[in-house]
Design a protein with these regions (language model features):
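Peripheral, non-catalytic segments that deliver or gate enzyme domains
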Residues: 1-240
Length: 240
C-alpha cells in the first residue's frame, strides 16, 4: 500500500534472480497464503466498501486474468480470509462479521479446490476449527458464553466431544499445536494464563514462569517446524 488506502498490491519476486515474476495483483487485503508446492498463492480481493469478500487462487507465472475464484461471500456484512492449517493438511476459509462466523475447508492436494462448509452460520455464534494429529478442534461460543473447545475425528459426521469445557467467569482461548503438545490460554479474574497438555498422556498443567501475581504471558512460534519441545514465551507486568 503506497497511498495509505489499505488497498494492497501484491508482487511476487523470485529470490534467485530478484526479479518480479508476476504482474501486480491490486486491490487486495494484503494477506498471502502459499500452496505447499509454491506453485500458487491464495489471496482476497477488496470490494468498493473495503471488505474482503472473494478468495482467489493465482498460479505463479501465469496471467492475473487466469486467477481462479474459489470462494465468494454473498453477505456485504461479512469479510473472508484464508489460511493453512497447523498440520498443513487443509486450507480453512473463514468468513465473519462482528459476532457471527462460518468456516469452510478443502484439502491441500485438491487440484480444483472445492471448499466444504463445516457448520452453517448462526447469528451470535462464533467458531474456529483447526486440525492437528488427525483431529479437529473447534473453539466456539455456541452454548458457551465465554467459549469452549470441542474435538472430533472427522468433519464429515462431526461427532463433537468436549475437550475444554466452558466454565463460569473463565474466558477460554485458542490452541497452539506442537508435535507432542497443545498449548492453550484462558483468562480469569482479569489474569491471563497458559496451559500445556501432553498429547499422549492427556496431562495438562499451567505454565508459570514468574513469581509476580499479575502478569500477561504470551507465546510465539518463530520456527515453522512444529516437531519441537521448545517454544518462545514472553510476559509483561507492572514491574517487568
Amino acid at each position: 500500500d503506497t497511498k495509505g488506502s489499505e488497498y494492497y498490491t501484491i508482487f511476487i519476486r523470485e529470490i534467485k534472480t530478484n526479479n518480479v515474476i508476476t504482474k501486480e495483483i491490486s486491490e487486495t487485503s494484503g494477506g498471502i497464503t502459499f500452496s505447499l508446492d509454491d506453485k500458487y498463492i491464495f489471496y482476497s480481493k477488496l470490494d468498493e466498501n473495503h471488505r474482503a469478500r472473494k478468495i482467489f487462487r493465482h498460479e505463479i507465472g501465469k496471467l492475473n486474468s487466469e486467477d481462479e475464484l474459489i470462494f465468494e461471500e454473498k453477505s456485504e456484512a461479512f469479510t473472508v480470509s484464508i489460511g493453512l492449517s497447523s498440520d498443513e493438511k487443509y486450507y480453512f476459509i473463514n468468513t465473519s462479521d462482528h459476532n457471527t462466523s462460518e468456516q469452510y475447508y478443502f484439502g491441500v492436494n485438491e487440484k480444483k479446490p472445492s471448499p466444504k462448509l463445516i457448520m452453517q452460520r448462526e447469528r451470535g455464534v462464533i467458531y474456529s476449527v483447526s486440525s492437528w494429529d488427525n483431529k479437529f478442534y473447534n473453539h466456539t461460543n455456541k452454548n458457551a458464553e465465554d467459549f469452549k473447545i470441542d474435538v472430533t475425528d472427522s468433519l464429515l459426521d462431526q461427532k463433537w466431544e468436549t475437550f475444554i469445557p466452558a466454565r463460569n467467569e473463565v474466558l477460554i482461548g485458542g490452541c497452539t499445536f506442537l508435535k507432542n503438545w497443545i498449548i492453550r490460554s484462558e483468562t480469569s479474574n482479569a489474569l491471563d494464563k497458559l496451559f500445556v497438555r501432553n498429547i499422549s498422556s492427556g496431562i495438562e498443567e499451567e505454565l508459570r514462569f514468574s513469581d509476580e501475581k499479575v502478569y500477561v504471558p504470551g507465546i510465539s512460534l518463530i520456527q515453522k517446524d512444529r516437531d519441537t519441545d521448545e517454544v518462545h514465551l514472553g510476559y509483561s507486568s507492572p514491574k517487568t
